[in-house]
Amino acid sequence: VTAGYYTAACVFAGSLMRPLGGALADRIGGIRSLLVMYTCASICIAAVGFNLPSAYAALGLFVVAMLSLGAGNGAVFQLVPQRFRKEIGVMTGLIGMAGGIGGFCLTAGLGAIKQSTGDYQLGLWLFASLGVLAWFGLHGVKRRWRTTWGSAAVTAARV
């Protein structure tokens, strides 16, 4: 029952932050917002991987990580119409699909790692590493994205 309450707290926090993350992205920019959110989430999730002595400390860090990821979700949806003007529908569908698959793979992966190693440490660090990888990926393409946004050659759908 306690694990269910903790899960609900994380899901609620992430969901609540989506519109606020979109508003923040409108104010400071979607890319900048996402870079901050990836940093915060990665640090919090990596910290939980150090086997904290208190379940409440772990919960607090997970909630902050989920707040960050929820805000990042809002930032992603702020970026979609800027980057993919003619494919907004398909892109939002793909983003939603990726989120659903990612949520499934995360829980399945963490469970498999726990079963094979006896704890979640490696899985949490791998998950934090994905945030770092996303940060570097976004940082690496941001200049190219900014110079090609709105270009019909880049954003037009092709079959």
What are these regions (language model features)?
Residues 122-140:
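Symmetry-related core transmembrane helices of the 12-TM Major Facilitator Superfamily/SLC fold
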Residues 39-53:
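C-terminal ends and interior cores of transmembrane alpha-helices
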Residues 11-19, 100-104:
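Residue-level signature of mid-helix packing/kink "hotspots" within the transmembrane helices
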Residues 71-84:
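Intracellular juxtamembrane helix-capping segments at the cytosolic ends
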Residues 24-25, 109-118:
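Interfacial helix-cap and linker-helix signal at transmembrane-aqueous boundaries
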Residues 26-38:
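Cytoplasmic membrane-interface "Motif A"-like loop-to-helix N-cap segments
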